[in-house]
Swiss-Prot record:
SUPFAM superfamilies: RPB6/omega subunit-like. It comes from the Eukaryota. HAMAP family: RNApol_bact_RpoZ (MF_00366). The gene is rpoZ. Transmembrane segments: none annotated. This is Putative DNA-directed RNA polymerase subunit omega. It is found in: Plastid, Chloroplast. Keywords: Chloroplast, DNA-directed RNA polymerase, Nucleotidyltransferase, Plastid, Transcription, Transferase. Its EC number is 2.7.7.6. It comes from Pyropia yezoensis. Belongs to the RNA polymerase subunit omega family.
Length: 75
């Protein structure tokens, strides 16, 4: 999660576009991002990692990593 601390808005925009380009259904991925962000918000209510990184941005970054680096999940 430390890598997410140094992102600026252009990096976030790039990652969002990368996520949208990697999927065939933009609506479905948007709903998945929203659901993950909502779930993370309520699961991590006691844990304050970084108030600068909003749950939706964290969800986008995690999902891009999962899609572009499948070896993360397979381990």
């Amino acid at each position: 999660m430390n890598q997410h601390n140094s992102l600026d808005s252009s990096d976030i925009t790039y990652k969002t576009e990368e996520l949208l380009e990697a999927t065939t259904n933009r609506y479905k991925i948007t709903v998945q991002v929203a659901n993950r962000a909502k779930r993370r918000k309520y699961e991590d209510v006691d844990i304050i990692d970084d108030p600068q990184v909003k749950p939706v941005i964290r969800a986008i970054l995690e999902m891009v990593d999962e899609i572009t680096q499948p070896e993360i999940i397979s381990d």
